[in-house]
UniProtKB/Swiss-Prot annotation:
It comes from the Eukaryota. The gene is HAT2. It is found in: Cytoplasm; Nucleus. It comes from Cryptococcus neoformans var. neoformans serotype D (strain JEC21 / ATCC MYA-565) (Filobasidiella neoformans). Residues 370-374 are annotated as: Interaction with the histone H4 N-terminus. The lineage of its organism: Eukaryota, Fungi, Dikarya, Basidiomycota, Agaricomycotina. Belongs to the WD repeat RBAP46/RBAP48/MSI1 family. Transmembrane segments: none annotated. This is Histone acetyltransferase type B subunit 2.
Amino acid sequence: MAHNEPITIDDAGDDFDAVEDNQAINEQYKVWKKNTPFLYDTVITHALTWPSLTCQWLPDITDVPDTDYTSQRLIIGTHTSGQANDHLIIAEVLLPKKGAGISDKALADLYDEEKQEIGSYTASPARIRAIQTINHAGEVNRARYMPQNPELIATKTVTGEVYVFDRTKHESKAPANGECKPDIRLKGQTKEGYGLSWNALKEGHILSASEDTTIGHWDIQGYSKQDPSLQPLRLYTGHSAYVADVEWHPKNENMFGSVSDDGQIMIWDTRSDNTAKASSQVQGHNAEINCISFAPSSEYLFLTGSSDNTIALWDLRKLSTKHHSFEAHTNDVLQLSWSPTSPVHFASASADRRVHIWDLDAIGAEQTPDDAEDGPPELLFVHGGHTSKVCDISWSPSSPWTIASASEDNILQVWEPSRHLRTPYEAEFDEKDLE
């Protein structure tokens, strides 16, 4: 609204509601901050210069000599809305080593209210810092590394192209001229999107989901330095609306799943010649589906998250039946991340400013009325540290129970729920329980 426009009664009401909403959000945040020492073993809150729409842990971890810290790396990006050059960023995160011998009381005493951090065992440099910036044309909608070579990072752009950067061929600090020089350009889609997935079993194969209703499939091993632009091996055209997400199956190199604003879940087989019709599909939700995630330890189970505020659990053997609906979010479910070490736990991010951790083992468990007021039995933990929509989450492959979450108000958080809250729930899950 321009400053010189008269405020109508309706506008004034909207402004008043917005102020009330902000006050409520701030009050909730104060309560969360007060309870942080009792809910977490680690919390790091880092204010970015620009919001990041994406975050993903890199798989490496190194000890920092003569300290109680390990060093891990995160891939993030910028969303400057044209106000500055955009960048793909590699950030270093210093995390306390496990088993450092800190008592619970000492841990609570080490809570730094000003920094909003817990787990600062020793004096240290900045806990999160950029160690490499690479120029990017427009905001980084999503960034994901190739499993077989984590130095190769693909990004979703606002133009529809997918960029691939070999970060070892770029300086640690991006040139000030802002010129974007991806090592490979994947062409063929005409609109932006967010879904991006590397094949963990077939090196170089990557999928991209687009607002132009297509799914692109490329093999980057087909590129040459003389011509770094690649056309897709295939464009899949089965969806009738914006394709929000796509993911390769972790145990079948020929299978992938896609979800769309059309409410459809589609399972594709790359050995089929029909790129217009999926091998199987189902109406998954009665609203837009925003994300899909296959269970890394299962051949059959996967999750979908929707703008109907729910997460659905599916079994590929019985796709016509939704096996369970996880219900606790109060706004769109935007992203999902399975634990890399536990087959029964996953995290979900939502526009309701929350990240939830869920426990498949607890589905159907008995609850007291008091417990039921806090949510269903399978809701293990609620992270309330964000005051704006959570855009992306990533579960650390190197530090069990450590999660990174990025929100649209420039905040990046790295956190680990208290071991006392999670220990009773670290159990085994049997897929036969679903049958």
